[in-house]
């Protein structure tokens, strides 16, 4: 229902002055070149979304296998993590608009400078989100109604999230915002295939079903992909393959 209302509001607002609104006459018009360019950028994003969605679902199954207390703690941790991630998600959207606008206007040098500055901002945002997690953790633990065992798991998970947020912030802004603005969408799919499906999921699965690691250690394995891909992200960023004008 929320998404339907959001779509309706977006369509209504799009007909106001200064906005681009749907043109029903051209809605089903097919431009072969535009479709080709769109598929080149969109298909890797579709693959990345599939990798990410299925991967996160498997994380929940690991926690569920570890018991009721682990599943309960993971549910609370997921909500808190998603709320804090709103900071990086907002900056990511802004980064895509700012960098994409400059690159599309042909201002490649300015777009590159914006990308560098936004990367630095994402680092600061990640550190702030990490500190926010550490500060609010005792307050959240005070208000949630969990068993002592689940509360202990949740406390450890909050510590993991504090480190996780630094990687998540940088990756959100850089991969989803800056790289996406320049059409460099293949990196997102590759990084998820390697760091999530070849690292995080196998480690978490082994820890859950074979080695029987502690709950917090398995949870840390499910978060290792965001931190593990950081060196790769920085290296790819400095290649500046994303500095290109997609309108030509």
Per-region residue spans from a language model:
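Hydrophobic/aromatic residues in alpha-helical transmembrane segments
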Residues: 10, 55, 59, 95, ...
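Hydrophobic/aromatic residues within the transmembrane alpha-helices of Major Facilitator Superfamily
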Residues: 8, 50-54, 83, 87, ...
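C-terminal structured "cap/appendage" subdomains that terminate the fold
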Residues: 178, 186-198, 205-213, 217-220
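Alpha-helical transmembrane segments of multi-pass membrane proteins
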Residues: 80-84, 148-174, 194
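Helix-terminus/linker motif at the lipid-water interface of multi-pass membrane proteins
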Residues: 46, 50-83, 101-102, 141-148, ...
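Small-residue-rich hydrophobic transmembrane alpha-helices
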Residues: 60, 73-137, 169-191
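Core transmembrane alpha-helical segments of multi-pass membrane transporters/permeases
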Residues: 33-62, 90, 94, 123-126
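Short alpha-helical transmembrane segments in multi-pass integral membrane proteins
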Residues: 1-43, 99-165, 206-248
